[in-house]
A protein has these predicted regions:
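PLD/PLD-like phosphodiesterase catalytic module centered on the HKD motif
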Residues: 1-206
Length: 206
C-alpha cells in the first residue's frame, strides 16, 4: 500500500491514526514515501519515533498528537484519496511487536457512508485546537496556530452530539440525523478529500 502511494509521487497521500510509531522498517518506508513527495499525516497519541520536516528525509511528514478527556484506542490506516482511497481500521500500532510478533487483522472499509464518516472524523481531529499538539523537527510538541478560530475539541464535539441524540425523541433523532448527514455531505462535496492536502499545505507554511 505504501509502495502504491510512492508510485503516485506528489499525488500520493497516507493518513494514519494509531497510538505509537516505533517500527524502524516502517519509519524508513515513510521516509522513502516522503522523499517521493507523498504527503503523510500521522495522528499518534503516544510514542512517535519519526521526526517530521527533516530536510531530505521527512519533509512531507506531519505528526499530530491528541491527548484529551478520553483514552482513545482507534487505529485508522488511509492510503490514497477520492475514489482511489483504501481505508482500513484495526488494532495494530506501528510497532515491531505488532508487525513482527503478532498476527494482526485490519478491516477494509467498503461502505461509502462509513468511509465518509471516518474521513470526517479524521478531518475534525485535525481541526482540534484544544488538545491537539503538532510535533516539531526537534521532537518537541507545540499547539497549532488557532488565532482567530473558536476553540474546537474533537472529543467534546462527538460527545455533545451523542448526548444530544440520546435526549431527543425517536422521530427527532431521525430528523436530526438527516440534517446532520446532509450538512456533512455538503461539506464532503465542498472539501472532498482535498481537505488533507490543504491542511498539510497550511501547516507547512507555519
Amino acid at each position: 500500500l505504501i509502495d502504491e502511494e510512492i508510485a503516485k509521487g506528489s499525488k500520493g497521500q497516507i493518513v494514519i491514526k494509531a497510538n505509537s510509531v516505533t517500527d524502524r522498517e516502517l519509519i524508513d518506508k515513510f521516509s522513502e514515501a516522503s522523499c517521493a513527495g507523498v504527503k503523510i499525516i500521522l495522528i499518534i497519541r503516544g510514542i512517535c519515533c519519526i521526526l517530521p520536516n527533516i530536510h531530505g528525509k521527512t519533509d512531507n511528514v506531519m505528526v499530530n498528537s491528541i491527548v484529551g478527556r478520553f483514552l482513545e484506542h482507534s487505529r485508522i490506516y488511509s492510503f490514497g484519496t477520492g475514489e482511489d482511497q483504501k481505508l482500513y481500521i484495526g488494532s495494530a500500532d506501528i510497532m515491531t511487536r505488532n508487525q513482527d510478533r503478532r498476527t494482526e487483522i485490519a478491516c477494509p472499509i467498503k461502505s461509502p457512508e462509513i468511509k465518509a464518516f471516518i474521513n470526517r472524523y479524521i478531518r475534525r481531529s485535525l481541526q482540534d485546537n484544544v488538545n491537539r499538539r503538532v510535533m516539531l523537527p526537534n521532537g518537541e510538541y507545540a499547539m497549532p496556530d488557532s488565532k482567530g478560530k473558536d476553540p474546537f475539541d474533537v472529543q467534546e464535539y462527538y460527545l455533545s452530539h451523542a448526548i444530544h441524540l440520546s435526549k431527543s425523541k425517536t422521530h427527532d433523532k431521525s430528523h436530526h440525523k438527516i440534517k446532520y448527514e446532509a450538512k456533512d455531505k455538503m461539506q464532503d462535496k465542498k472539501l472532498n478529500l482535498s481537505f488533507f492536502d490543504k491542511f498539510f499545505k497550511r501547516s507547512k507554511k507555519k
